[in-house]
């Protein structure tokens, strides 16, 4: 008997995606667009993960090494959706610490607008979504996941998926299924979490007049 056999089986899907962040929603929408019956499980009240919930404000790295690369697929849909609501200026260049040699291409965006765009993309693709739903474990058979158990206001339930995609924040589904995992680098050091904030009444002329050492000191404080 598996751990979660006593709980009701409420659905069988081609694809079950755990985690509705940027990776999870894109995986779910892509699967559904290709005709797969897809379920997306997200423990929070919204999709987008830290991109929407932590006010990140910019999607980074849109270049082919020299210039901004053309966007395709889900990302192109995100960009066009943001532009339709005036939620972005498109792909722009920024300079880390104000240095011309540290140029990167980003999509600045309004987090609330991105949240709406993501929800629309998922709905249009036909993905079934359960919010406020926390995955608590999986059952396995012959080296594959046979059921995903989760908890929400309806209590503990489970679903089956021919394919289960772990897009959770911690990789907990893969770990519970017995996959090998590693937290951090060889010393267990993790990348610090990011939480953005907005500032008003900033003297931009004074900032522009800062020397490079001053800007470096500001950057080391996590401000720029």
Residue ranges, per PLM feature:
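Conserved N-terminal/central alpha/beta ligand/cofactor-binding core
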Residues: 4, 30, 36-37, 42-137, ...
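Beta1/beta-strand and adjacent pyrophosphate-binding region of the FAD-binding site
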Residues: 7-21
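Core beta-strand elements of the Rossmann-like FAD/NAD(P) dinucleotide-binding domain
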Residues: 11-13, 154-163
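Short hydrophobic core segments
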Residues: 18, 159-170
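N-terminal Rossmann-fold NAD(P) dinucleotide-binding loop
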Residues: 24
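Short, solvent-exposed loop/turn and secondary-structure capping segments
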Residues: 28, 49-53, 174-180
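Conserved beta-strand-loop-beta-strand element in the redox core of flavoprotein oxidoreductases
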Residues: 139-158
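Rossmann-like dinucleotide-binding core of oxidoreductases
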Residues: 171-224
């Amino acid at each position: 008997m598996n751990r979660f056999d006593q709980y009701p089986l409420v659905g069988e899907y081609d694809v079950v995606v755990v985690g509705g962040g940027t990776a999870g929603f894109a995986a779910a929408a892509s699967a559904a667009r290709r005709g797969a019956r897809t379920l997306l499980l997200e423990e929070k009240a919204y999709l987008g993960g830290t991109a929407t919930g932590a006010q990140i404000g910019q999607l980074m790295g849109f270049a082919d090494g020299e210039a901004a690369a053309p966007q395709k697929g889900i990302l192109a849909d995100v960009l066009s959706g943001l532009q339709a609501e005036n939620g972005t200026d498109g792909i722009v260049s920024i300079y880390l610490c104000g240095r011309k040699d540290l140029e990167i291409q980003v999509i600045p965006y309004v987090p609330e607008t991105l949240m709406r765009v993501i929800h629309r993309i998922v709905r249009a693709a036909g993905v079934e979504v359960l919010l406020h739903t926390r995955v608590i474990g999986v059952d396995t058979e012959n080296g594959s996941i046979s059921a995903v158990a989760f908890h929400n206001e309806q209590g503990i339930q489970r679903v089956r998926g021919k394919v289960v995609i772990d897009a959770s924040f911690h990789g907990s589904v893969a770990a519970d299924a017995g996959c090998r995992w590693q937290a951090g680098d060889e010393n267990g050091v993790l990348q610090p979490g990011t939480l953005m904030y907005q500032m008003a009444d900033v003297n931009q002329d004074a900032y522009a007049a800062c020397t490079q050492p001053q800007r470096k000191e500001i950057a080391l404080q996590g401000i720029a």
